[in-house]
Swiss-Prot record:
Keyword Transmembrane helix in record: yes
Topology of the protein relative to the lipid bilayer: Multi-pass membrane protein
Origin organism lineage: Bacteria, Bacillati, Actinomycetota, Actinomycetes, Mycobacteriales
Composition-biased stretches (Low complexity): 896-940
Keywords: Cell membrane, Membrane, Transmembrane, Transmembrane helix
Name the record gives this protein: UPF0182 protein Mflv_4654
Keyword Transmembrane attributed: yes
Length: 1004
C-alpha cells in the first residue's frame, strides 16, 4: 500500500473571507462589548467611592492568573501536539482508498497552523477563564501569615492550611489537567500522523510515540504521588460518614494516613517503572504500573481503612475516638469564637419563685419588656407613616437601641422610609419621573418597643399602635427630629428597598430649577436638588453613551435633563456596595439603619470565613442560619460551607451619599490581616470607630445563629459524653402557629448578664432545648454593649423547665385566654396574630415568657387593617398572666406591685398628625368576661371589655331584666361547657352568650 496523495482543500473567495471576518468581529463585539462596558462602568463606580485600587487589584490579579494559566496549559497542550507532529513517521501506509484516518490527516495538514495553534489556544483560554476565578486563593497565598496555633497532628501552623494548602492544591490540579490534556493531544496526534497504527493483529507504535506517551504517564503518576502527600493534611478537615465530628478520627490517623504514605511510595515506584519502559521497550511495564496503582488505591486506600473501622473502631468507638473528639472540641471552639475568653457558662435554676417586689426590683428587664414585634408592626408603619404611595417600609423591620430623655437605654423598632420605584403609578413611571424626579426616600421612623399608644380592647378601638418618632423633612422644609436621636439629613438615596427595583439608578445634579420630589406644603409640592458627593458624573458624551448602552436607554443621549452637572446614582443596595468594595467578605443577611452623628447610615456586618480549619466542625451557612423570619422573607444566607468564621468587619453605608466605610472589628483575625495586605488602606482600624457608631453596633444575627448551632454540641467537654450525644441541645422550633422553621434569636434590652450587675444591656438572645425534647436546656445571650461587646453568656438550666413550645402551648390553651381570643376572632371578624415569644431571665433564677397578641379587623394582611396590640400574655413557672398591657399581665401573674417599674401605654393621640381611626365596617361585639382560671385570685385580673350590665340600685325595666337573665344563663352554660370539655357545646355557648349580650345592649 502506498501513501494516498493529499487532496486539495477548496479555497474561500475574497468575499467569503470578508463576510467571515465581519461576522467574527460582530460576534466578538456581542460577546465582549457588554463585558468592556461593565468594566468601564465599574472603574468609574469604584473611583467615585474611593476604592479604585480594589478594582484595579482585582483586575490585575485576574489578568495575571488568566495569562499564566492560559500560557502554561496552552503551552503544555501545544507541546504534546507539536512533538507528535515533529516526530511523525516519514512514510505512513494507508489502509486503502477509503481510509478515514487519511482523510482526517489530509484535512489537518491543510489547516495545520490553525489547528496546531487554535486548539491549544482555545484550551488555554478556557483554562485561564476558570483559573482567574481563583484569584482570592492566590492572593491569600501571597499575603497570608501565621495563626500562632499549630494543628494537633503534624504540628504545623494553621496558616499553612488556611493560605498555603489550597494554593498548592490549585497548582497541582492545573498541572494534572495540563499533563493529562497533553497526553490526550499527543496520543491523538500520533494516531493521526501515523505514530500509532491499529492495523493488523498487534498494531504498531513508533519509538517517539512510545517515549512521549510513557513520559507523560510517568509525570501523571508523579503528580498523583504529590497529591497523596497533600491528602494527608486534608484529612484533618474532612468529614466522613458515621463520625459525629469533623477531622481525622482513629481510622484516619491509624489506617488512612499510613495508607496515603504507602500509596505515595507505590505511585513513585510505578512512575519509575513506567519511565524504565522507555529503555526496556516493554509496554507491559507501564500497564502493570497503572494497574498496580489502581489496585493499591482500592486495597490499601479503601479496603484496609474499612477493615480497621469495622473490626477495631466500631466495637469501641467512644474510647477509640475520644482523643480526636477532644481535638475537634478544642478546634471548633477556637474557629467559631467559642473559647473561654468569649463564652461564660453559669448554672441557672430557671424555675425559682419570684415575688412582686423582686419583679419590680428587676427594673432593667421589666421596664423594657418588648411588646412590638418588628415582623408584625410593619403595616402600622405603612398606615401611619408612609405618606405617599411610592414610600415603603419592608415587611420585616429592625431593632436598635437609643437613650431616652432620661438617659435610660431603650430598644426601638426602626425603619427608613425609602422610595420604592415599583410602587410608582401612571405617569410616575415615565422615565423622566422615575429616574430624575422620584429619586429618594425621606425619614427615619422609630418606635419604642416597650410601649404602644393607648389600649385597644379590641381591634376596632383606637389604640394599640406604635408610638412613632418620625425624623423627616417637614412641611416647612425644616427637618423635624423628635428622636430617638437628632437627625440633620433624613433624605435616603441608598437602601435595600430602592435597590430592589430593576434599573434602580437615579440621575441627580443641578439642572436649573430643582426637579426631585421632596415634600409637600399645604398648597404646593417642593422639589430638591441632590448636593451629596456620591454619584458618577455623566456630563460628557462618552459616559452618557456608555450608560445608554449599559441600560439600553436612549434617553441618556437625547434627554435635556442631563447636563454637565448631572451624576448617576446606581448600585444602591448597602450590602451589595460593601461586597463590591470588599469581595472577600460574606455579609449578614440583615442590614439595619441607624442615626450616627446626625446622619442615617446602613450598618452591615461582614464575615471572613474558611472551610478547611483542621478539626473544626464544617457548617453550611444557609442551613444553620435558617429560622422562621428568614423563611418568611425568603432571605437565606449563601449555601456555603465554613469551618471558621469571624465578624471581622463592620461596614457603614451613608444613606445620603452612599459612602462606604469599612472598620476592622476583629483586628486579630489572620484572614482579615491577609486581606488588609492585599488591599491596603481599604479597611480602617478599629480605633476609628466613633463612640456614636459603637453605640449602634449589634452582635450580628447570622454569626449568633451559627454559634448557637455549634454550642448545641460543643458546650460538652467530655468526649465520651459528646460521642453519646446525650447532653446535646437543640435550637427550638418557633412555636408561633404561622412559623415553619427554627425560632429566631431576639434583640432585647434587659438586665446585663455579661456583667451580672442589674444594669440594662442590649443583647441578642436565644433559648435552647434539650436534645429532641421540648424542655429548656440553656439560655444564650450575646452582649452588644460597647464595654462587653461579643461576650456570650450561657445560662445552663437543669431539670424539666418548660421550653418555648411548652410555654406557648400553655399560654395559648389557657382557658381564659383562648376563650377571649376565640370571641374576638370568631367567624373571621378579626385576625389574631401572636407576636414573638420572648424568654427573659427574671428575679433570682426564674424565666419569664412574654408573648404580645395582636389583632386586626378582617382576615387579610391589607395595610389598611394593620394589627394592634390587644393583649400581653406571660408565663412564669407554671403560672400565667394576661392583660391588655404589660402592667396588667405582670399584676395578674405576680400580684399587686409587680408592675411598679414596668412601662405602661402612652396616651392615645393621633399619630403623625392623623386623626384617630376606627377601622373596618364591622363592629366586633365586646368580649365577654371569661371565667377566672382555677387557682388564681381575680384581684389581679386585667380589666377587659365586659358586656355585663350594671348591678346595684339601678332600676331595670322588665325587658332589660329578662335580657339580663338570658346573659346570666348564657354565662352558666359557658361555664358548664368549659367543665365538660365539649368544644362543640363550648362554641354554641359562646354564640349564645354573644346573642344575649347584644340583646341586652339593644333593650331599653
Amino acid at each position: 500500500m502506498g501513501m494516498r496523495p493529499a487532496a486539495r482543500m477548496p479555497s474561500l473567495t475574497q468575499r467569503s473571507r470578508f463576510l467571515i471576518a465581519v461576522s467574527a468581529v460582530l460576534v466578538l463585539l456581542l460577546l465582549l462589548g457588554p463585558r468592556f462596558i461593565d468594566t468601564y462602568v465599574d472603574w468609574l463606580w469604584f473611583g467615585e467611592l474611593g476604592y479604585r485600587s480594589v478594582f484595579t487589584t482585582q483586575i490585575i490579579t485576574r489578568l495575571v492568573i488568566f495569562f499564566v494559566v492560559a500560557i502554561l496549559v496552552g503551552a503544555v497542550v501545544f507541546a504534546g501536539l507539536a512533538l507528535a507532529y515533529r516526530t511523525r513517521p516519514v512514510f505512513v501506509p494507508t489502509a486503502g482508498p477509503n481510509d478515514p484516518i487519511a482523510r482526517y490527516r489530509t484535512a489537518v495538514m491543510a489547516r495545520l497552523r490553525l489547528i496546531g495553534i487554535g486548539v491549544p489556544l482555545a484550551i488555554g483560554v478556557l483554562a485561564g477563564f476558570v483559573g482567574q476565578s481563583y484569584w482570592q486563593r492566590v492572593q491569600l497565598f501571597l499575603h497570608g501569615g501565621d495563626f500562632g496555633v499549630s494543628d494537633p497532628q503534624f504540628g504545623i501552623d494553621l496558616g499553612f492550611y488556611a493560605f498555603d494548602l489550597p494554593f498548592y492544591r490549585l497548582v497541582l490540579t492545573y498541572l494534572f489537567v495540563g499533563v493529562f490534556l497533553a497526553f490526550l493531544a499527543n496520543l491523538l496526534g500520533h494516531y493521526l500522523f501515523g505514530g500509532i497504527r491499529l492495523a493488523g493483529r498487534s498494531g504498531a507504535l513508533s519509538r517517539a510515540a512510545r517515549i512521549q506517551l510513557i513520559t507523560l504517564v510517568g509525570l501523571l503518576m508523579l503528580l498523583k504521588a504529590v497529591a497523596y502527600w497533600f491528602d494527608r493534611y486534608e484529612l484533618l478537615s474532612h468529614t466522613r460518614g458515621g463520625k459525629p465530628f469533623t477531622g481525622a478520627g482513629y481510622t484516619d490517623i491509624n489506617a488512612v494516613l499510613p495508607a496515603k504514605l504507602i500509596l505515595m511510595a507505590i505511585a513513585v515506584i510505578c512512575a519509575v517503572a513506567v519511565f524504565s519502559a522507555i529503555f526496556l521497550r516493554d509496554l507491559r511495564i507501564p500497564a502493570i504500573g497503572v494497574v498496580l496503582l489502581l489496585l493499591s488505591s482500592l486495597v490499601v486506600g479503601a479496603g484496609w481503612p474499612l477493615v480497621v473501622e469495622q473490626i477495631s473502631v466500631r466495637p469501641n468507638a467512644a474510647q477509640k475516638e475520644s482523643e480526636y473528639i477532644s481535638r475537634s472540641i478544642t478546634a471548633t471552639r477556637q474557629a467559631y469564637g467559642l473559647t473561654e475568653e468569649s463564652v461564660t457558662y453559669r448554672d441557672y435554676p430557671g424555675n425559682a419563685s419570684a415575688t412582686a417586689q423582686q419583679v419590680a426590683a428587676d427594673r432593667a428587664t421589666t421596664s423594657n419588656i418588648r411588646v412590638l414585634d418588628p415582623n408584625i408592626v410593619a403595616p402600622a408603619f405603612t398606615q401611619f407613616q408612609q405618606g405617599k404611595n411610592f414610600y415603603f417600609f419592608p415587611d420585616q423591620l429592625n431593632m436598635d437601641r437609643y437613650r431616652d430623655d432620661s438617659g435610660n437605654l431603650r430598644d426601638y423598632v426602626v425603619a427608613a422610609r425609602e422610595l420604592n420605584p415599583d410602587r410608582l403609578i401612571d405617569n410616575q413611571r415615565d422615565w423622566i419621573n422615575r429616574h430624575t424626579v422620584f429619586t429618594h426616600g425621606n425619614g427615619f421612623i422609630a418606635s419604642p418597643a416597650n410601649t404602644v399608644r393607648g389600649i385597644a380592647n379590641d381591634p376596632n378601638q383606637n389604640g394599640g399602635y406604635p408610638e412613632f418618632l418620625a425624623s423627616v423633612v417637614g412641611a416647612n422644609g425644616e427637618v423635624s427630629s423628635p428622636g430617638p436621636a437628632p437627625l440633620a439629613q433624613p433624605r435616603i438615596y441608598f437602601g435595600p428597598v430602592i435597590a430592589s427595583a430593576a434599573d434602580d439608578y437615579a440621575i441627580v445634579g443641578e439642572s436649573g430649577t430643582p426637579r426631585e420630589y421632596d415634600y409637600e406644603t399645604n398648597t404646593d409640592t417642593r422639589n430638591y436638588t441632590y448636593t451629596g458627593s456620591g454619584g458618577v458624573p455623566i456630563g460628557n458624551w462618552l459616559t452618557r453613551s456608555v450608560f445608554a448602552a449599559k441600560y439600553a436607554e436612549r434617553n441618556f443621549l437625547f434627554s435635556n435633563v442631563i447636563n454637565e452637572n448631572s451624576k448617576i446614582l446606581f448600585n444602591r443596595d448597602p450590602a451589595d456596595r460593601v461586597e463590591a468594595v470588599a469581595p472577600w467578605l460574606t455579609t449578614d443577611t440583615t442590614v439595619y439603619p441607624a442615626i450616627v452623628n446626625e446622619r442615617i447610615v446602613w450598618i452591615v456586618d461582614g464575615y471572613t470565613t474558611l472551610d478547611n480549619y483542621p478539626y473544626s466542625e464544617l457548617s453550611t451557612l444557609s442551613s444553620v442560619t435558617t429560622d422562621s423570619n428568614e423563611v418568611a422573607q425568603n432571605r437565606l444566607q449563601l449555601d456555603k460551607q465554613v469551618s471558621y468564621i469571624r465578624n471581622s468587619v463592620k461596614a457603614t453605608v451613608d444613606a445620603y451619599d452612599g459612602t462606604v466605610t469599612l472598620y476592622a472589628q476583629d483586628e486579630q483575625d489572620p484572614v482579615l490581616q491577609a486581606w488588609m495586605k492585599v488591599f491596603p488602606d481599604s479597611v480602617k482600624p478599629k480605633s476609628d470607630i466613633t463612640p456614636e457608631l459603637q453605640e449602634h453596633l449589634r452582635y450580628p444575627e447570622d454569626l449568633f445563629k451559627v454559634q448557637r448551632a455549634l454550642l448545641a454540641k460543643y458546650h460538652v467537654d467530655d468526649p465520651v459524653t459528646f460521642f453519646s450525644t446525650s447532653d446535646f441541645w437543640d435550637v427550638p422550633l418557633d412555636p408561633n402557629p404561622t412559623a415553619s422553621s427554627y425560632q429566631p434569636p431576639y434583640y432585647i434590652v434587659a438586665k446585663d448578664l455579661a456583667e451580672n450587675n442589674g444594669s440594662a444591656s442590649f443583647q441578642l438572645t436565644s433559648a435552647m432545648n434539650r436534645f429532641r425534647r421540648d424542655f429548656l436546656a440553656a439560655y444564650i445571650s450575646a452582649s452588644s454593649d460597647p464595654e462587653t461587646y461579643g461576650r456570650l453568656t450561657v445560662l445552663t438550666v437543669p431539670g424539666q423547665v418548660n421550653g418555648p413550645k411548652l410555654a406557648f402551648n400553655a399560654i395559648s390553651t389557657d382557658t381564659a385566654i383562648s376563650t377571649e381570643l376565640g370571641q374576638i376572632g370568631r367567624d373571621g371578624q378579626n385576625r389574631i396574630r401572636w407576636g414573638n415569644l420572648l424568654t427573659l431571665p427574671m428575679g433570682d433564677g426564674g424565666l419569664l415568657y412574654v408573648a404580645p397578641i395582636y389583632a386586626s379587623p378582617g382576615n387579610t394582611d391589607a395595610a389598611s387593617t394593620y394589627p394592634r396590640l390587644i393583649r400581653v400574655a406571660m408565663m412564669y413557672n407554671d403560672q400565667i398572666g394576661y392583660g391588655p398591657t404589660v402592667r396588667d399581665a405582670l399584676t395578674d401573674l405576680f400580684g399587686p406591685g409587680a408592675d411598679a417599674t414596668a412601662t405602661g401605654p402612652a396616651a392615645t393621640e393621633p399619630p403623625a398628625g392623623q386623626a384617630p381611626q376606627t377601622q373596618g365596617n364591622n363592629t366586633a361585639p365586646p368580649a365577654a368576661q371569661p371565667p377566672n382560671r382555677q387557682g388564681q385570685a381575680p384581684a389581679g385580673r386585667p380589666e377587659v371589655p365586659v358586656a355585663v350590665p350594671p348591678t346595684g340600685p339601678t332600676q331595670l325595666s322588665a325587658a332589660k331584666s329578662a335580657a339580663l337573665q338570658d346573659v346570666n344563663a348564657a354565662l352558666d352554660a359557658l361555664r358548664g361547657a368549659q367543665e365538660s370539655g365539649d368544644f362543640a357545646q363550648y362554641g354554641e355557648a359562646l354564640q349564645r352568650l354573644d346573642d344575649a349580650v347584644n340583646k341586652y345592649q339593644e333593650t331599653d
